[in-house]
Structures are given as C-alpha cells and as structure tokens.
C-alpha cells in the first residue's frame, strides 16, 4: 500500500489558492476598494438629507479654508474639521443601516446605538464650529472693524 505524501494530504485538506478565486491584490484591490467607497458615498447622499446638507457646507467651506490668510497647520485644521463631520456622518449612516437591516422593531439597544451615532455627529459639528471660530474668528473681527 502506498501512502500519500504529506504534501498531497495537506493539499486535499485545503485546496490550493487559484487565480480568480475572488481575492484581489495590488492595484486591482485598491481600485475595487475605491469603487465600494464611491458606492457608500452615493448611497449616503441618496438616503441621508443631513449628509447632503453637510456636503453642501463642505463645498463652501473647503475652498474658503484654502483662501484664508492662515498658516498651513491652521489650513489643515480647518479642512480636517469639515471632513471630520462628513466622516462621522458616514459612520453614523452605516450604523443606522446595519441596525435597520437587523430589525425595524424598536429595541432599547438599537435606539442607544443610533443615539450614540447621532451624538458623535454632534460632537464632530461642535469640533468644526470651535475650530473655525478660533482660527477665523479673529480674522473676521479684524475685517469687520476695518470695513464697518
């Protein structure tokens, strides 16, 4: 009786990885990740009015951040505070979608998760307002004093 070699027996336990088995690598993987990211942004735009409003605000504030006479670090803080709101809104929307996928019934834990997501968006908005107020407030005050 001939016994199979260890390489043969291990290959039967786990089939060898073949190209095209659903796993992508390299640039192709990055391309598909970007496509999924785009799909998430489009779905959130379509389903969430708050996200649409925040994107409209970002479209106004981001160019202003790059036109303000501030340091590079302050410019990054201004832009990051705007993008933070969008990031947290995307995460909040994903939490809400996952909970709604599980069940539309009211449940204390589902409500708590949605409330925490909403609170996170509020905290991000407060960070944005504080950042813009601290950096741009003095500049706005100087401009108003000079022109009024």
What role is predicted for each listed range?
Residues 1-35, 39-40, 46-86, 90-94, ...:
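Hydrophobic alpha-helical transmembrane segments
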Residues 41, 96, 113:
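Residue-level signal for inorganic ion chemistry
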Residues 100-116:
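Amphipathic, cytosolic membrane-interfacial segments at TM-TM junctions
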